[in-house]
UniProtKB/Swiss-Prot annotation:
<dbReference type="GO" id="GO:0031252">
    <property type="term" value="C:cell leading edge"/>
</dbReference>
<dbReference type="Pfam" id="PF23106">
    <property type="entry name" value="EGF_Teneurin"/>
</dbReference>
<dbReference type="GO" id="GO:0031581">
    <property type="term" value="P:hemidesmosome assembly"/>
</dbReference>
<feature type="disulfide bond">
    <location>
        <begin position="680"/>
        <end position="706"/>
    </location>
</feature>
<feature type="disulfide bond">
    <location>
        <begin position="503"/>
        <end position="518"/>
    </location>
</feature>
<dbReference type="GO" id="GO:0035878">
    <property type="term" value="P:nail development"/>
</dbReference>
<dbReference type="GO" id="GO:0009986">
    <property type="term" value="C:cell surface"/>
</dbReference>
<dbReference type="Pfam" id="PF00362">
    <property type="entry name" value="Integrin_beta"/>
</dbReference>
<feature type="disulfide bond">
    <location>
        <begin position="564"/>
        <end position="573"/>
    </location>
</feature>
<feature type="region of interest" description="Disordered">
    <location>
        <begin position="1495"/>
        <end position="1525"/>
    </location>
</feature>
<feature type="glycosylation site" description="N-linked (GlcNAc...) asparagine">
    <location>
        <position position="695"/>
    </location>
</feature>
<dbReference type="GO" id="GO:0070062">
    <property type="term" value="C:extracellular exosome"/>
</dbReference>
<dbReference type="GO" id="GO:0007160">
    <property type="term" value="P:cell-matrix adhesion"/>
</dbReference>
<feature type="binding site" description="in LIMBS binding site">
    <location>
        <position position="176"/>
    </location>
    <ligand>
        <name>Ca(2+) 2</name>
    </ligand>
</feature>
<dbReference type="Pfam" id="PF07965">
    <property type="entry name" value="Integrin_B_tail"/>
</dbReference>
<keyword id="KW-0965">Cell junction</keyword>
<dbReference type="GO" id="GO:0046872">
    <property type="term" value="F:metal ion binding"/>
</dbReference>
């Protein structure tokens, strides 16, 4: 059991010592954590331990030292011990010529949050073995590079022998994967892609590493070039195989491995799109796959490796890459090489002639750098390597000295949390084998882990222990009660209510006042010490507060009252018992003018000029009292002044005239003023306390001090002498100038009068500089008489070769800022140096007005800005004059004109009405400056202020050259003309700044505590200077000014500046008002490698106590006041949005002594590491500059002298909505001259949830001014962003506006003005397949919006809610053409006679019979004469609504085409029409079916006799019922954005779907028949994808569809081309940096076939949308689709909008393939194809068709889609293939693309030699 216990006094002493020595933060974590078990305790902090002593009554979770001090036995304390053991250590042998590291292995176990430091030794010899492997691109464009490499074999060997005596050299080559699209797979190209070349391959190891240089040269001579198609190469495959195939390549274990990668192209990488195009989906397995010939074999089955894979494998095998690339691909590899710890990048010349020099330079650079990285480290462990011997570079490697044993410090730290989860809850992140590896050798292997063991006492618990009254388990020294029991021994039933009466306070109905729990007749209060008393009636947070602190922080709250510390009294402990604060400067109490009460003086006679100890404030009396007494003294003593006469009687003091006045130090104040009446000066003094009263006396000197008598008679004489004096001065000046010119010609005189710079070189360090200029002294020697002016200039970046040439090539029209400095002809005052004073503002306005007036004569000059004033030290006799500094923006080419004009105006001493001093100006451009300085007579030294052009992009060491040009005025000669200035930019080891740019403090705090933080980038100490600067607060009146240095020791990251605040005097309130006092603290002069960060200046706002918000809530959440003054977590955090960009966050102060609070806030969903920090001195803060309608998370902690306390609970809050921005660009689909379809994009910044749009349109005149009222349309569905506007006035311009509304209101409008009639016309082309995006080729390169068709817009307003088609039709249908005013492009209308309108239901079997009598349905399936068509048994949705006998087919209305088939067979089973049941077709009937084209993949197409995209539905009534319920709709938008000449972003909008989406599929292929590629997107929230490695100037077709659990939805299709300039020698390789545009294909428009007779047809097509030149004609070829005959060619001349060709001599029932190409002066463009068949059949009994009918079908035969046409001589119209038909008007679809890509357009079919009228449709975008 327990041993002897220490005495209570010993415990007390030990606890006091520990409380002083230990950090409060650690104690807080162990004691404050809400733990319930031993295991939870030891995981809180690395220093936490647990006491299992049964008799222990204190808190069991604490530090081990405090548990011992509290009486817990050492053997009862559970603590987890860390371990560190070196398992392998071999000392470094410097005699060996190989890289070594010591130790080689260790085992370490750490507790969460614990760190372990150890040293690591690494040795790199002066010379080590080198393995050099050259990996070269063997594509055709590298042929000259290969030839040069063959010639340079001897030079390569020579360089290697200079680098090391032990080397091997090898060679490998690569091209790309031998598959489509990377390689041309035609047999002849696979054999020889280029003349005299090898077959294509992926990678081949040609020469393994060998010491025989001759063998290397001989084998290299036999190599030939190869080739591929696309520009990027497959070099990543080659690099990976080179790394992992160590035996095949021949890497030696102890040598330096160098891999030279030479190419001129970009690279393929994992999942970049080319692999998908090639059908390769599996990842690279990172294994060696070389055959016996050294050829890579798995290029067809495995993807390219990723960049992280290559980085990891090259580091694992100690391979250092050297990228030797040409300028064309330099930008790609410039970023790539930064991912490798140690690598090199060099620019390879076009023919690789400099590869040897590049290799030598790279090797020298690499061998001086060493990188040490931790590989395979678990997420719970962090490793950091530092060194005191070697400097760290930007990339993290060390700049080493080879031949020395380097010592490195390794820090291994076990994290407590990983991504917000405790590391002990993540078993996979707790341990691992870390490989600490340097660049050139094997490294240290660490078996590291985190201790997350369970306490052994928890595994040995006593279940239902007798110690716990059999009502609980005894675990780790205490009882864990079962449910329903409580108490230390679980002997109290929580369910018993019989004993709560003793816990009820008189007059209350809640036991324990609602603040505790009644257990066995006794109250157990909540809050762990917050509530006290028999009934928990006292709240220890409700005692009085002073300045926000409980009991003034000078006592504790007990039983509802403050128990004050010794020396303090009062209800809130705010009165000191001593009178130390009342002692005056003489040692008395309140200067004898009052008494001391509660530590403050209460003066008997209060005055404006008495301070807090009743002492007269003479500094406040002097400036105000003299002025107050002046008028009364003047009128009483001399009878003069403004109060002379009766008003003099108002003076309330007496005047006594005396002969002599006392000295100033003997009286309160001594004053002197000038009497305006006689110009004499009178003096007086004031005695006493300085407060004039009725009994006060002012002593006045009897005698005034008057000036001597006047001499008015001299004035006329002087007026006469002035002209003579002027003439004399003029003659003297001429004589002196002549003498000086003569003296300048004499050698003896000339030699002694020189000007020049004092020094010829300055060396500056940028981190020690306090300004961006340098005052460079210039001396004048010899005779100092007269005036000399020196003209000078400074040039930046003299160290860069060719810098002047580069500067000359810069755009001359580019606007650059010019700095201008002038010396004004006026003295400088203190107010001019303060930018917020009125005098400064007036002068600034005067300067800017006059200078703008002068410089406006130079073209392109903007107005002045940033005007400020200063003084120039060391400026001779004019250093008290005002210098103005300003900036004006002007073109770069305007510099000579600016310089000439400035010199001219300075010589004239005026800029318009602004007077300036001569001989001084400075004009600063972006890279140079010119100026002028003046030596006045007798002046020996002046300073030249030289700008230093400090910029972040400067070189580490840059040079400036200052040059004295000439002496335009004066006789001096130039001595030292040149000054070199060198500026060294050291890499910052750390950055020092303030925590925030502004702090708010209370005057009652007495001290402003300002945190200064240091972001440590490297070890060592840092130092900065600081000083305060007055603002509206004044030093020694509001605060005590301070200045000094802050020294950060190594590892220190936070310091605090303290500025003492002074109490506000009453006189300050009267004289200075209630303005906010603020002063500034600035950091400067960083030392020891420190840099100043932002902000390096902060503003301190002093708020008076009555200004602060002191509202504290009376009820607070329970929290234990921690012992020893530790801080708790702030309570009751509350956040409330104060606007769209503000959140008000407040909380209740914690217990303890908080000095301030730190608020951390971030956007919800972001990582907490991206949080913003804010400091506050009061328990509330306003978060500003937030995003509207955005969710934020925040929490707060308090900090004090011992550090930060715990954070509060997390609070989230959403900002209010803000009005949205204007909608996206408006797009117009011009249907006719009076009908347009208007669409718009969603606002770029919705700032909330869009609820509606408002569209307004109205007439405007020629000046775009409105005519009459605007019409408004409210679109209350925010997803419908389209509107069809009809009945507009023809040939009239309209103004259209669209604005959006959210919860905050209406946003700004987007406006467009367009006249439909004035737009260019072209033949109408309405796709049968809707929702195809149309790209406006004339809109430039901005493709944010697209014109498109939408079934949301093209609905019939009087029809159903969705476009629908049904074959539930009644009999006796009659077609009525929609011509004239009834023309509606949105509908195809079939009308029944009113007497025959049926009423059909979903189960109706009624069918259609073409003008046949209506009969009952035939379910028997037998044929009959004149019978009706039986309905298919295939289940379908309800039938179409019939209104007024009209059935509306949406046109184009849906994504499916309409197909009406006619047949003359007597009775046939159309088994191909339905995959489920036979579909019977009678000889005299017609059926309406639906053809699912290539944009809709039907799930019902199972028959192999049909094309895969063909399906027939017998009854479909609505848009939503075309597919199974829950199947996604078509994505509602398809948008293309070009990212480069070979990359494209494809975006779409989420489709409607009743079920959750599971992802998307994106397919794309070349329009002319390339291989199909598919991208699967499993994330339904991702609605865009980037497609790389497209071929430039090639057309691609894209299809997007969505998937739910019910299956795939319909597709959205679009065609796009990226046009760019290509390399002359490689047509598929775009020129780097060339412009690229997004466009549609330049093929002719869709082909339209019109059958004229059984053996002839008419072919028509449109002019290409992008002709790319002048069209001179077309080439049309016709051939049999199945072969069997030669092709026939036709030439069609002209450039009309639509061209036609009649083709005779065709055969019936034979499919023909037609191709049309446009011909320009540059050649033929891409071709448009179509297949047509003229079928001739006998006519059936169709009265409206006659004997022949035209039948259009769309089976996909072979790889083309085709159209079958049956000629008819009928004059009546009919519906064919879902197209619009009228009298003598039939439109057919034309096949445009191969495979599954079809583009259907409506066209005219002439049946009787008469052509119907065309309708126009244009597309424009504003």
């Amino acid at each position: 059991m327990a041993g002897p216990r220490p005495s209570p006094w010993a415990r007390l002493l030990l606890a006091a010592l520990i409380s002083v020595s230990l950090s409060g933060t650690l104690a807080n974590r162990c004691k404050k954590a809400p733990v319930k078990s031993c295991t939870e305790c030891v995981r809180v902090d690395k220093d936490c331990a647990y006491c299992t002593d049964e008799m222990f009554r204190d808190r069991r979770c604490n530090t081990q030292a405090e548990l011992l001090a509290a009486g817990c036995q050492r053997e009862s304390i559970v603590v987890m011990e860390s371990s560190f053991q070196i398992t392998e250590e071999t000392q470094i042998d410097t005699t060996l010529r190989r890289s070594q590291m010591s130790p080689q292995g260790l085992r370490v176990r750490l507790r969460p949050g614990e760190e372990r430091h150890f040293e690591l030794e690494v040795f790199e010899p002066l010379e080590s073995p080198v393995d050099l492997y050259i990996l070269m691109d063997f594509s055709n464009s590298m042929s000259d590079d290969l030839d040069n490499l063959k010639k340079m074999g001897q030079n390569l060997a020579r360089v290697l022998s200079q680098l090391t005596s032990d080397y091997t050299i090898g060679f490998g080559k690569f091209v790309d994967k031998v598959s489509v699209p990377q390689t041309d797979m035609r047999p002849e190209k696979l054999k020889e892609p280029w003349p005299n070349s090898d077959p294509p391959f992926s990678f081949k190891n040609v020469i393994s590493l060998t010491e025989d240089v001759d063998e290397f040269r001989n084998k290299l001579q036999g190599e030939r070039i190869s080739g591929n198609l696309d520009a990027p190469e497959g070099g990543f495959d080659a690099i990976l195989q080179t790394a992992v195939c160590t035996r095949d390549i021949g890497w030696r274990p102890d040598s330096t491995h160098l891999l030279v990668f030479s190419t001129e192209s970009a690279f393929h990488y994992e999942a970049d799109g080319a692999n998908v195009l090639a059908g390769i989906m599996s990842r690279n397995d990172e294994r060696c796959h070389l055959d016996t010939t050294g050829t890579y074999t798995q290029y067809r089955t495995q993807d390219y490796p990723s960049v992280p894979t290559l980085v990891r494998l090259l580091a694992k095998h100690n391979i250092i890459p050297i990228f030797a690339v040409t300028n064309y691909s330099y930008s790609y590899y410039e970023k790539l090489h930064t991912y490798f710890p140690v690598s090199s990048l060099g620019v390879l010349q076009e023919d690789s002639s400099n590869i040897v020099e590049l290799l030598e330079e790279a090797f020298n650079r690499i061998r001086s750098n060493l990188d040490i990285r931790a590989l395979d480290s678990p997420r719970g462990l962090r490793t950091e390597v530092t060194s005191k011997m070697f400097q760290k570079t930007r990339t993290g490697s060390f700049h080493i000295r080879r031949g020395e044993v380097g010592i490195y410090q390794v820090q291994l730290r076990a994290l407590e949390h990983v991504d917000g989860t405790h590391v002990c809850q993540l078993p996979e992140d707790q341990k691992g084998n870390i490989h600490l590896k340097p660049s050139f050798s094997d490294g240290l292997k660490m078996d590291a882990g985190i201790i997350c063991d369970v306490c052994t006492c928890e595994l040995q618990k006593e279940v239902r222990s007798a110690r716990c009254s059999f009502n609980g388990d005894f675990v780790c020294g205490q009882c864990v009660c079962s449910e329903g029991w409580s108490g230390q021994t679980c002997n109290c039933s929580t369910g018993s209510l019989s004993d709560i009466q003793p816990c009820l306070r008189e007059g209350e109905d809640k036991p324990c006042s609602g603040r505790g729990e009644c257990q066995c007749g006794h109250c157990v209060c909540y809050g762990e010490g917050r509530y006290e008393g028999q009934f928990c009636e006292y709240d220890n947070f409700q005692c009085p507060r002073t300045s926000g602190f409980l009991c003034n922080d000078r006592g504790r709250c007990s039983m509802g009252q403050c128990v004050c510390e010794p020396g303090w009294t009062g209800p809130s402990c705010d009165c000191p018992l001593s009178n130390a604060t009342c002692i005056d400067s003489n040692g008395g109490i309140c200067n004898g003018r009052g008494h001391c009460e509660c530590g403050r003086c209460h003066c008997h006679q209060q005055s404006l000029y008495t301070d807090t100890i009743c002492e007269i404030n003479y500094s406040a009396i002097h400036p105000g009292l003299c002025e107050d007494l002046r008028s009364c003294v003047q009128c009483q003593a001399w009878g003069t002044g403004e109060k002379k006469g009766r008003t003099c009687e108002e003076c309330n003091f007496k005047v006594k005239m005396v002969d002599e006045l006392k000295r100033a130090e003997e009286v309160v104040v001594r004053c002197s003023f000038r009497d305006e009446d006689d110009d004499c000066t009178y003096s007086y003094t004031m005695e006493g306390d300085g407060a004039p009263g009725p009994n006060s006396t002012v002593l006045v000197h009897k005698k005034k001090d008057c000036p001597p008598g006047s001499f008015w008679w001299l004035i006329p004489l002087l007026l006469l002498l002035l002209p003579l004096l002027a003439l004399l001065l003029l003659l003297c000046w001429k004589y002196c100038a002549c003498c000086k010119a003569c003296l300048a010609l004499l050698p003896c005189c000339n030699r002694g009068h020189m000007v020049g710079f004092k020094e010829d070189h300055y060396m500056l360090r940028e981190n020690l500089m306090a300004s961006d200029h340098l005052d460079t002294p210039m001396l004048r020697s010899g005779n100092l008489k007269g005036r000399d002016v020196v003209r000078w200039k400074v040039t930046n970046n003299m160290q860069r070769p060719g810098f002047a040439t580069h500067a000359a090539s810069i755009n001359p029209t580019e606007l650059v800022p010019y700095g201008l400095s002038l010396r004004l002809a006026r003295l400088c005052t203190e107010n001019l140096l303060k930018p917020d004073t009125r005098e400064c503002a007036q002068l600034r306005q005067e300067v800017e007005e006059n200078l703008n007036e002068v410089y406006r004569q130079i073209s392109g000059v903007h107005k002045l800005q940033q005007t400020k004033f200063r003084q120039q030290p060391n400026a001779g006799k004019k250093q008290d004059h005002t210098i103005v500094d300003t900036v004006l923006m002007a073109p770069r080419s305007a510099k000579p004109a600016l310089l000439k004009l400035t010199e001219k105006q300075v010589e004239q001493r005026a800029f318009h009405d602004l007077k300036v001093a001569p001989g001084y100006y400075t004009l600063t451009a972006d890279q140079d400056a010119r100026g002028m300085v003046e030596f006045q007579e007798g002046v020996e030294l002046v300073d030249v202020r030289v700008p230093l052009f400090i910029r972040p992009e400067d070189d580490d060491e840059k040079q400036l050259l200052v040059e004295a040009i000439d002496v335009p005025a004066g006789t001096a000669t130039l001595g030292r003309r040149l000054v070199n200035i060198t500026i060294i930019k050291e890499q910052a080891r750390d950055v020092v700044s303030f925590e925030q740019p502004e702090f708010s403090v209370s005057r009652g705090d007495q001290v402003a505590r300002i945190p200064v933080i240091r972001r440590v980038l490297d070890g060592g100490k840092s130092q900065v200077s600081y000083r305060t600067q007055d603002g509206t607060a004044q030093g020694n009146r509001d605060y005590i000014p301070v200045e000094g240095e802050l020294l950060f020791q190594p590892g220190e990251a936070w310091k605090e500046l303290q500025v003492k605040l002074l109490e506000l005097q009453e006189v300050d309130s009267l004289l200075r008002g209630r303005q906010v006092r603020r002063f500034h603290v600035q950091l400067s002069n960083p030392k020891f490698g420190a840099h100043l960060g932002q902000p390096h200046s902060t503003t301190i706002i002093i708020r008076d106590p009555d200004e602060l918000d002191r509202s504290f809530t009376s009820q607070m959440l329970s929290s234990q006041p921690p012992p020893h003054g530790d801080l708790g977590a702030p309570q009751n955090p509350n956040a409330k949005a104060a606007g769209s960009r503000k959140i008000h966050f407040n909380w209740l102060p914690p217990s303890g002594k908080p000095m301030g609070y730190r608020v951390k806030y971030w956007i919800q969903g972001d990582s907490e590491s991206e949080a913003h920090l804010l400091d506050s001195k009061v328990p509330s803060v306003e978060l500003t500059n937030l995003y509207p309608y955005c969710d934020y998370e925040m929490k707060v902690c308090a900090y004090g002298a011992q550090g930060e306390g715990p954070y509060s609970s997390l609070v989230s809050c959403r900002t209010h909505q803000e009005v949205p921005s204007e909608p996206g660009r408006l797009a117009f689909n011009v249907v006719s001259s009076t009908v347009t379809q208007l669409s718009w994009a969603e606002p770029a910044e919705t700032n909330g949830e869009i609820t509606a749009y408002e569209v307004c349109y109205g007439l405007v005149n020629d000046d775009n001014r409105p005519i009459g009222p605007m019409k408004k349309v409210l679109v209350d569905n925010p997803k419908n962003r389209m509107l069809l506007i009809e009945n507009l006035r023809e040939s009239q311009p309209y103004r259209y506006t669209v604005k959006a509304r959210n919860g905050a209101g209406w946003g700004p409008e987007r406006e467009a003005i367009i006249n439909l009639a004035t737009q260019p016309k072209r033949p109408m082309s309405i796709p049968i397949i809707p929702d195809i995006p149309i790209v406006d080729a004339q809109s430039g390169e901005d493709y944010d919006s697209f014109l498109m068709y939408s079934d949301d817009v093209l609905r019939s307003p009087s029809g159903s809610q969705r476009p629908s088609v049904s074959d539930d039709t009644g009999c006796g249908w009659k077609f009525e053409p929609l011509l004239g005013e009834e023309l509606d492009l949105r509908r195809v209308t079939w009308r029944l006679p009113p007497e025959l309108i049926p009423r059909l239901s979903a189960s109706s079997g009624r069918s259609s019979d073409a003008e046949a009598p209506h009969g009952p349905p035939d379910d028997g399936g037998a044929g009959g004469k004149g019978g009706s068509l039986p309905r298919s048994a295939t289940p379908g949705p309800p039938g179409e609504h019939l209104v007024n006998g009209r059935m509306d087919f949406a046109f184009p209305g849906s994504t499916n085409s309409l197909h009406r088939m006619t047949t003359t067979s007597a009775a046939a089973y159309g088994t191909h029409l339905s995959p489920h049941v036979p579909h019977r077709v009678l000889s005299t009937s017609s059926t309406l079916t639906r053809d699912y084209n290539s944009l809709t993949r039907s799930e019902h197409s199972h028959s192999t006799t049909l094309p895969r995209d063909y399906s027939t539905l017998t009854s479909v009534s609505s848009h939503d019922s075309r597919l199974t319920a829950g199947v996604p709709d078509t994505p509602t938008r398809l948008v293309f954005s070009a990212l480069g000449p070979t990359s494209l972003r494809v975006s779409w909008q989420e489709p409607r779907c009743e079920r959750p989406l599971q992802g998307y599929s994106v397919e794309y292929q070349l329009l002319n028949g390339g291989e199909l590629h598919r991208l699967n997107i499993p994330n339904p929230a991702q609605t865009s994808v980037v497609v790389e490695d497209l071929l430039p100037n090639h057309s691609y077709v894209f299809r997007v569809r969505a998937q739910s659990q019910e299956g795939w939805g319909r597709e959205r299709e679009g065609v796009i081309t990226i046009e760019s300039q290509v390399h002359p020698q490689s047509p598929l390789c775009p020129l780097p940096g060339s412009a690229f545009t997004l466009s549609t294909p330049s093929a002719p428009g869709p082909l339209v076939f019109t059958a004229l007779s059984p053996d002839s047809l008419q072919l028509s097509w449109e002019r290409p949308r992008r002709p790319n030149g002048d069209i001179v004609g077309y080439l049309v070829t016709c051939e049999m689709a199945q072969g069997g005959g030669p092709a026939t060619a036709f030439r069609v001349d002209g450039d009309s909008p639509e061209s036609r060709l009649t083709v005779p001599g065709l055969s019936e029932n034979v499919p023909y393939k037609f191709k049309v190409q446009a011909r320009t002066t540059e050649g033929f463009g891409p071709e448009r194809e179509g297949i047509i068949t003229i079928e001739s059949q006998d006519g059936g009994p169709f009265p409206q068709l006659g004997s022949r009918a035209g039948l259009f079908q769309h089976p996909l035969q072979s790889e083309y889609s085709s159209i079958t046409t049956t000629h008819t001589s009928a004059t009546e119209p009919f519906l064919v293939d879902g197209l619009t038909l009228g009298a003598q008007h039939l439109e057919a679809g034309g096949s445009l693309t191969r495979h599954v890509t079809q583009e259907f357009v409506s066209r005219t079919l002439t049946t009787s030699g008469t052509l119907s009228t065309h309708m126009d449709q244009q597309f424009f975008q504003t």
